Amino acid sequence: MKKIAIILVVSLCCLQSVLAQDGTKMEAENANYSNCKLINDKKYSGGKALELTDENARINFSYQAPERGKYTIHVGYDALYGPKMVNVTVNGSTFSFQTGNTVMEEAEVGTFFMNQGANSIVITPSWTWFRIDYIRIEKGGSTLEFDIAANPVDTHASDAARTLYTFLYENFGKKTISGIMTGDMTTANGNVTQHADVQAVYKASGKYPALVGFDFMNATGKSGNSSWNKSYTTASIKLAEDTYKRGGIPAFTWHWRDPSRRTDAFYTADCNMKITDAMNADGTWNTSSALYANIIKDIDTVADYFLSMQSKGMACVFRPLHEASGGWFWWGREGAVPFVKLYRLVYDEMVNVKGVHNVIWIWNAGENDRDWNPGDNYYDVVSADIYNNDFDYSSNYVSFDKLKTLTKGKKIIALSENGPIPDIEREFEEEAVWSWWMPWYQTWNGKFVDKTSTAEWKKCMNDSRVITLNDLAGWDVYATIEIPTATNATRQEIYDLQGRRLFSVPSKGFYIMNGKKFLK
């Protein structure tokens, strides 16, 4: 008691740090704050809270960590008038979380790396009009281990898709695949290394990205049959084919234009498209409706492009219905239940009806999107879209950990859209090794390559833990082989693509060959 009394006399701020190390609370009113209103009310811890109604409001806690490591931060808040977005910045790395509708609640924000000694924890509003009561810090984080399936969810996946999935599976946690999104399609003439967006990465780093993003946004919709739209999609497919031929990974997104054909829009604000307009009152699909017919027609159009690539022995990754929980695209307008039904319809129509088996499926999720999960059997990879401030090379490990928890460690995790690239040292140091990252395009005045410095581009792209197109010898050097069951045999013979015997293996299963390396 004497020691505590001395601390109280010296500094209340120091008491905050000592108590927090024991997992207790740090009161908001005892932190350094500005542009906040102090609220006196006995319902709050300590009888006080800070109200954030000013967009410039700021609460800065100083936490003395006993050692470097992971710490889980909880925030006690009062949402006042419904859900709000709250920013929590730890030593310069920002993570945003959404409050619930509950008036007073404690939220687990996430697990953060902290240094031994002083650490800055800053709370600011993304949306105003809420109150912060306290934060609570606990040592340690999730101990969840990865347990990822060795095969894609499509049980009839093509050899090319199995090979691609195995490539992602074997490299996950060991290396990160570099990527770039493409926008403009008026140049390059089918040579992906000459595309302006790919060239921007090459000019900044001296190497080409291994994964290249394309968009089906002009393949369907009210103007889908226009010559310009068709030429855009055709150019994209040619570049995807060239990417694959060079050993790279084509990654497709689909900004799905209004299937009702009333507009050419995909943003919620620009169209009235509702998924439920194609459903019966009981939530089943109204298969006789015109809207349902248009939805199927659009899905089949995209499926046919995949089938064309499938016939050429290609495989791709595909991220349909992205960023749904944000609500800014029509497929997220009505919430999780209609979204899940639409995602499953896209998958079932493509895979089970059309026979598309050359796709690795991505569910693009928010960190707390449990209700939006289409089901573990409908996707291979979970991904996040994160745009840090320019030249902020954070690993975004909080989001990585959230997605790991969301999928119970059973899925590969990718950064499917980003601004600045994550620093490779921080990815490994902070245990957030994304399967791949993909900055948005440089063309169309996007300039997303410029949001990473040339020095950082060179550092990351020349690191042995980052896979570039320069590192890949081409998919024809890989072979995925199903070993037949042999009742009396103890080993199975392995041959290369030219029929030459390489060696034997002791068991049946799917194997992948990469040069001299042989993996099960």
Predicted regions and their residues:
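Extracytoplasmic
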Residues: 21-172
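N-terminal module-boundary/linker segments of secreted carbohydrate-active enzymes
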Residues: 138-211, 217, 226-230
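Aromatic- and acid-rich polysaccharide-binding/catalytic face
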Residues: 369-391, 440
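Aromatic-lined carbohydrate-recognition surfaces of secreted/lumenal glycan-active proteins
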Residues: 319-320, 343, 347-368, 411-420
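Substrate-binding cleft of extracellular glycoside hydrolase catalytic domains
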Residues: 222-345, 356
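Bacterial Sec-dependent N-terminal signal peptides
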Residues: 1-21
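Substrate-binding cleft of secreted/luminal carbohydrate-active enzymes
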Residues: 411-478
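C-terminal outer-membrane/trafficking sorting elements
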Residues: 479-520
